[in-house]
């Protein structure tokens, strides 16, 4: 097995700095996008509710026409 290679402290500092900056960026980006995604989900749920209501009404109208006395 090959022994571990000594890495310069400057390179280690650069790597950990990049890691920390990436984590910080991800956290801020997540906090920025989370409210937008919640709003999109809320709007999608409202649209789905409207579509379901329209489908229900159309189905009831179709059933009412099928059950008509004047067949």
UniProtKB/Swiss-Prot annotation:
Residues with N6-acetyllysine modification: 34
Record-linked InterPro entries: ATP_synth_F0_esu_mt (IPR008386)
An annotated Gene Ontology molecular function: proton-transporting ATP synthase activity, rotational mechanism
GO CC annotations, alphabetized: mitochondrial inner membrane; proton-transporting ATP synthase complex
Subcellular localization(s) per the UniProt record: Mitochondrion; Mitochondrion inner membrane
Domain of life per record: Eukaryota
Phosphoserine modified-residue sites: 68
Assigned keywords, A-Z: Acetylation, ATP synthesis, CF(0), Hydrogen ion transport, Ion transport, Membrane, Mitochondrion, Mitochondrion inner membrane, Phosphoprotein, Transport
Gene Ontology BP, a term: proton motive force-driven mitochondrial ATP synthesis
Membrane spanning residue stretches: none
Primary location recorded for the protein, binned into one broad class: mitochondrion
Subunit structure: Component of the ATP synthase complex composed at least of ATP5F1A/subunit alpha, ATP5F1B/subunit beta, ATP5MC1/subunit c (homooctomer), MT-ATP6/subunit a, MT-ATP8/subunit 8, ATP5ME/subunit e, ATP5MF/subunit f, ATP5MG/subunit g, ATP5MK/subunit k, ATP5MJ/subunit j, ATP5F1C/subunit gamma, ATP5F1D/subunit delta, ATP5F1E/subunit epsilon, ATP5PF/subunit F6, ATP5PB/subunit b, ATP5PD/subunit d, ATP5PO/subunit OSCP.
PANTHER family linked to this entry: ATP SYNTHASE E CHAIN, MITOCHONDRIAL (PTHR12427), ATP SYNTHASE SUBUNIT E, MITOCHONDRIAL (PTHR12427:SF1)
Family of this protein: Belongs to the ATPase e subunit family.
Cited function: Subunit e, of the mitochondrial membrane ATP synthase complex (F(1)F(0) ATP synthase or Complex V) that produces ATP from ADP in the presence of a proton gradient across the membrane which is generated by electron transport complexes of the respiratory chain. ATP synthase complex consist of a soluble F(1) head domain - the catalytic core - and a membrane F(1) domain - the membrane proton channel. These two domains are linked by a central stalk rotating inside the F(1) region and a stationary peripheral stalk.
Protein name: ATP synthase F(0) complex subunit e, mitochondrial
Protein's organism: Pongo abelii (Sumatran orangutan)
Organism lineage string: Eukaryota, Metazoa, Chordata, Craniata, Vertebrata
Gene: ATP5ME
């Amino acid at each position: 097995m090959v022994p571990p290679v000594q890495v310069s402290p400057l390179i280690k500092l650069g790597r950990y700095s990049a890691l920390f900056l990436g984590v910080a960026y991800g956290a801020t980006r997540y906090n920025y996008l989370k409210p937008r995604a919640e709003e999109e989900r809320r709007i999608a749920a409202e649209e789905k509710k409207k579509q379901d209501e329209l489908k229900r009404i159309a189905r009831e109208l179709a059933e009412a026409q099928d059950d008509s006395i004047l067949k």
